[in-house]
Amino acid sequence: DHPLLGSKLEKRDSTSSINMFDIAGETQWIGEISIGTPPQKMLVQFDTGSANVIIAPDAYKPSQSNSSFKAKDQFKTGYGDGTKVEGNVYVDNFELGGIKARNLSFGLTNENFLQDFERESSGIGGLSFPSISNFDSKYLTLIEALMQQKSLKQNVFQFTLKPGEGSTLIFGDIDHSKFNGDLTWVKVNPLFGFYIADAKINGKKIRTAVDSGTTVIIGSRSQVKDLVERTNGVHYAEDRSTNIGYGLFDCDFSPEVTITYGGTDFKLNRDQVSRGTANGKCLLSVIGIDSILPFDTW
């Protein structure tokens, strides 16, 4: 094992802000990180739905970093879109905005796993809890390291995502200028791995996993069908070839969809409530897919 594996990060109590931009028609946001000495820069998708940093093989060259260490362990992992990857665990120095972190583990895949529309990205930056890590527990995940080793001013991160310019990911602090009103806090259990929180959608109680790597709102087909049938102006349909349920509505109409967290209502605006069109109708940005997460989690 690497002699510094699991060693503490240099204590800085720091904050950093990473500029992000959207790709693939506002379906994903990517930002820059650096790995190695000297640093090798790359763009990754920061994902609260996975725990590990996974990098494509053409983005990182171990031979070009004098701080790189190839561990003995292999890894296998998969994502909700069906992508499956495998490769080798490495340990090296990271930089996230202004924060420098030493000896963090990541996976270097054997083959490129990113799709054509993701070609600007070099990998996945997992931000969830370590209980869903696909690495041995001796390897600290990014979030685990930043929290346990007191690298940040506060153990928080903040996404601000929008079309075009102005999107950011802040580590270690909260920028109140990025939003209106007060913050709403909800409890999550780290043992679940995902950021799972109780919520309501149009008044009905649901359990949700907040996932920055997912473009639309996803629930089970039965629950989405129930939601659509209770929402004025929207009718339910299913694609039998994919077993996906969805809602359709006239594009000159704006259905009301409200998500409630911690007693605070968040009403989807006109741009948020629809994700494209089909046969002259607008598609509701809530779809039904079974077997994505357990316990009917949205």
Residue ranges and their predicted role:
Residues 1-184, 225-260, 283-298:
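Non-catalytic N-lobe/flap surface of aspartyl protease domains
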Residues 7-11, 185-187, 209, 262, ...:
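N-terminal acidic, glycine/proline-rich low-complexity segments
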Residues 35-37, 96, 196, 201-202, ...:
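Structural motif
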Residues 168-205, 275-282:
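Flexible, small-/acidic-enriched active-site or ligand-binding loops
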Residues 191-234, 239-242, 246:
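Flexible, glycine-rich surface segments
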Residues 260-261, 266:
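Extended low-complexity, serine/threonine- and proline-enriched intrinsically disordered segments
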Residues 268-272:
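Edge beta-strands of extracellular beta-sandwich domains
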